[in-house]
């Protein structure tokens, strides 16, 4: 038995060495007048820099690791992830060149196992490579699902869910006050804000996409199942499996990650498939007209020529899955960071509440029409997005042709990583870049926007692949933050600062819980006037 294991090990090592030598020869740059970007030090044989991108606790956070390499090698350098050459950039000048002059050439995605197993073989918009299918699907999503008109039609969803969120927090405070269990924190009650904000955001997105709302009532089991399935998807979608770096080892499924991806994909397909069946049955019976995004997709995709091998149901399920994944996790991440920053900077929190008291008052709830007047609150959101972009490494791209970027030659099929986390902390652009100071967007930096035109600040990306849900995300961030700050005074449980440890993954979620002491600051009638949702 030991001899057989030795033979397998010898074969595997020999295969690795053979393919590595072949790749090393093929990876040599073509003869050109431009030199290649400097390669970061610390590469291991065969696997290259894979360890610093693994997300393993002992290896550090990938975007932080790449930021330190940028300090050493400059704003454009290369790393090796197994057989793949990867260019990492973090300067606004280079990024502008990429997303203007070379935008088409960097609008495709590399082929990874997550796209194959979790994203319906890359049918999801976020995983699909640039081409006719992606362009048509992007058009449908932008014009039919996430247009300003469609968001206006769905605005009641975010308002009602935010109101329900505020009311449920108030009811929790009332309960704790009546049974005396909240006395250890004075007049307030301790709330796990990561969980509460995550559930709020999920309910908003679920109602808009599939007409579903999850709570603790009759559909508690479905709620639990959906949360688990979505949690598995978020975790695994950002996982870089060994076979992505070393394709010839794919048959080994090292670590069993592909098996987990297939299981998660099957469960996700079952959940979204059940919703689709319900919608089709409603359409067939003639009950009502299109209301949520899935209804719209059923109607629109029928007559669309998407020039792809996917069937209609797969496209609908993949697109709705994209909207749920993109809409729930990323926005919740920013909520948590914003609240954490405010708790660590109480003077900023008080200033935001003073702005709300001035423009809205305490005799009514804040409305969407008030948001344009809340300039300081908008600056808080911008500053949060600057320091903690929800996707710190954006989405990995692939060069589809040879390019010259920043004076360096980049061959076709090179991968591209844009380190937004490092870009938005550039001391050449931002004074005191590590400080949380919303006032910067009311003074010298007030012209900076987050909509992809100012390449110093692109938390939602830029170019053709900019996040299509940008407007919805900003709308939700402003509304929820305004509602929460107007309705409650907030503080930490102890005198200690909030732990700001980051985590590795597709999104940059705060690594530790966020326990917050909330105390109502409005008249009781304003909480009780909120209509229950059933």
UniProtKB/Swiss-Prot annotation:
Membrane topology label: Single-pass membrane protein
Enzyme class (EC, first level): oxidoreductase
SUPFAM superfamilies reported in the protein's UniProt record: Cytochrome P450
Family matches, as InterPro entries: Cyt_P450, Cyt_P450_CS, Cyt_P450_E_grp-I, Cyt_P450_sf, Plant_Cytochrome_P450_Monoox
Transmembrane regions listed in the UniProt entry: 3-23
Required cofactor names: heme
Tissue-level expression: Expressed in leaves.
Biotechnology: applications noted: Nevadensin is a selective inhibitor of human carboxylesterase 1 (hCE-1), a key enzyme responsible for the hydrolysis of a wide range of endogenous and xenobiotic esters.
Catalysis performed (reactions): genkwanin + reduced [NADPH--hemoprotein reductase] + O2 = scutellarein 7-methyl ether + oxidized [NADPH--hemoprotein reductase] + H2O; (2S)-sakuranetin + reduced [NADPH--hemoprotein reductase] + O2 = (2S)-7-methylcarthamidin + oxidized [NADPH--hemoprotein reductase] + H2O + H(+); apigenin 4',7-dimethyl ether + reduced [NADPH--hemoprotein reductase] + O2 = ladanein + oxidized [NADPH--hemoprotein reductase] + H2O + H(+); (2S)-naringenin 4',7-dimethyl ether + reduced [NADPH--hemoprotein reductase] + O2 = (2S)-carthamidin-4',7-dimethyl ether + oxidized [NADPH--hemoprotein reductase] + H2O + H(+)
Main location: membrane
Signal found in the keyword field: no
Pfam families: p450
Family membership: Belongs to the cytochrome P450 family.
PANTHER family: CYTOCHROME P450, CYTOCHROME P450 82C3-RELATED
Function, in words: Hydroxylase involved in the biosynthesis of polymethoxylated flavonoids natural products such as nevadensin and salvigenin, aroma compounds which contribute to the flavor of sweet basil, and exhibit pharmacological activities such as anti-allergic, anti-oxidant, antibacterial, anti-proliferative, and anti-inflammatory effects. Catalyzes the 6-hydroxylation of 7-O-methylated precursors such as the conversion of genkwanin (GENK) to scutellarein-7-methyl ether (SCU7Me).
Protein name, per record: Flavonoid-6-hydroxylase
Organism phylogeny: Eukaryota, Viridiplantae, Streptophyta, Embryophyta, Tracheophyta
